[in-house]
Amino acid sequence: MFAPIIVKRRSKDEAEKPFWISYADRMTALMVLFLVVMSVALLAVTRTVSQIEQEKAQRQEDIAKLLDEVEQAADRYPGVKVDRDRDIIDFGDKAHFDKGRYSLNPDQDRLLRAFVPEVLAIARNDLGRKWLKQIVVEGFASPEGDYLYNLNLSLERSQRVLCTLFAPPYSDEKSMTPAELEQVRDLFLVGGYSFNATKYDAATRSYDESRRVELRLEFLGIGEARPPAPVLASGNFGKCALRG
């Protein structure tokens, strides 16, 4: 009357097969995930390092081109040289001072007022606007006398350079434009270094070369923002506070 009930028996292999993922399988999956994450992170770091190296190389290349332009300008003025290792414009004996003095002679005045506008033009080009941060007029003194006296004297020598640039030109000179003078005001700084970095001439047994000024070109670093220029009224540069 009743149909027989048939119970199907599972095979031995099927009965022993686990339902949940084993602990070893979980660890394997986590290890694979960890390796994938680490690979992605290492790839990102590698790309970042490579990008930084490319930016450094591009910066060095751009600055080298800028210094090439400054050298070309300096070549038109005998005695003016560019020290590429120190990013320095060296005027040689064209910007030497007498002992204990901070005044320049007329020929030195003319040289500065002729050469500096060429540097300003370079500062206005694409690479100059991109990398040139500021120009520091560095004054130096010979070791005769005490430190503080020479510190003040070296600062007066660097200040004299700016006074010369803002001074009325001689009748045979071309005047710097108001825009150029404003650029000098915004771009140039002065510094005095007393008798640090002295130069001794063994042949003449003198420190004449120590009594000098140099122009140091300072460049922006990678990612460094240019300091905002102060908002100042046009013109009205004032008068030189130095005597003579």
Could you describe each region identified by the protein language model?
Residues F97, R101-I135, F166, Y170-M176, ...:
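Periplasmic peptidoglycan-binding/anchoring modules of Gram-negative envelope and division proteins
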